[in-house]
Amino acid sequence: RFEYSSSPVTLVAALATCLREVHARYGADAIFEEILRLQDHFLEHLAHPDLKPLRFSRKHRSGILALYCPDLKGCAAALSTQDLICSPRGGYLRVAPHYYNTEEQVEQLAAALNRSGSGNP
């Protein structure tokens, strides 16, 4: 009836460190602003005519950007051969830069999509 278990001490310690070192240091608002800045930088470099970003007003934006891609699975597979992971979900390619990504990294993603937006590497 009762099962012995232990507390996930290591997970609690990891969460505490993450909250202290990241969220307390930078603040959630600053992290979110950096993510949106990187998204905008990515969109400035995205030029493939078949890729259409699903855009929302600033009030309704999130850290996830959805791109319409005619060959969704092929596009995701082509990106994965370049160690760029974007997941196909709900008919869109999910692009989600993190606050620690660099401008160069999102430019690399945009360049790869510009080359392979049709699903070809």
Task: Please provide the spans of the model-predicted regions.
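Pyridoxal 5′-phosphate
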Residues: 1-121
